[in-house]
Amino acid sequence: MAMTDPLGDMLTRIRNGQQAKKDSVLSPASKLRANVLEVLQREGYIRGYSEDASGKHAALRIELKYFEGEPAIKHVARVSKPGRRIYSGSKELPTVRNGLGITIVSTPKGVLSDNEARTQNVGGEVLAEVF
């Protein structure tokens, strides 16, 4: 059966891995997922990621980050879903926890955090929120 929300699946794997105190989790590879992971790494929510091509299909190995035993990601949620897409202009991008978290946005200039999108004055599809 086909997966209807690949990005939501990856975010759920990250959430479940952190709740189980795993060092890393695997997720099927795609360009969108890699771009979202790049934003999470730049913002300091994960230690890193790498492509793992040892199996039949390419996968992304996501290195989870903890601070004093607590997960770096307290909350991760999909905003724009396959059944209801959410778009926002650069001026209307939502803030998460008064700026303590980030919103991940897919823009014509690539996948960016809300701060980067505001700086570059671009809007787009609001993919997820993280804090």
UniProtKB/Swiss-Prot annotation:
Single GO cellular component term: ribosome
InterPro entries registered for this protein in UniProt: Ribosomal_uS8, Ribosomal_uS8_CS, Ribosomal_uS8_sf
Statement: the UniProt record of this protein carries the keyword Ribonucleoprotein: yes
SUPFAM superfamilies: Ribosomal protein S8
Any Pfam family matching the protein: Ribosomal_S8
Superkingdom assignment: Bacteria
Keywords: Ribonucleoprotein, Ribosomal protein, RNA-binding, rRNA-binding
BP term (GO), one: translation
GO MF assignments: rRNA binding; structural constituent of ribosome
Function: One of the primary rRNA binding proteins, it binds directly to 16S rRNA central domain where it helps coordinate assembly of the platform of the 30S subunit.
NCBIfam families reported for this sequence: PRK00136.1
UniProt family annotation: Belongs to the universal ribosomal protein uS8 family.
Assembly and binders: Part of the 30S ribosomal subunit. Contacts proteins S5 and S12.
Name used for this protein in its record: Small ribosomal subunit protein uS8
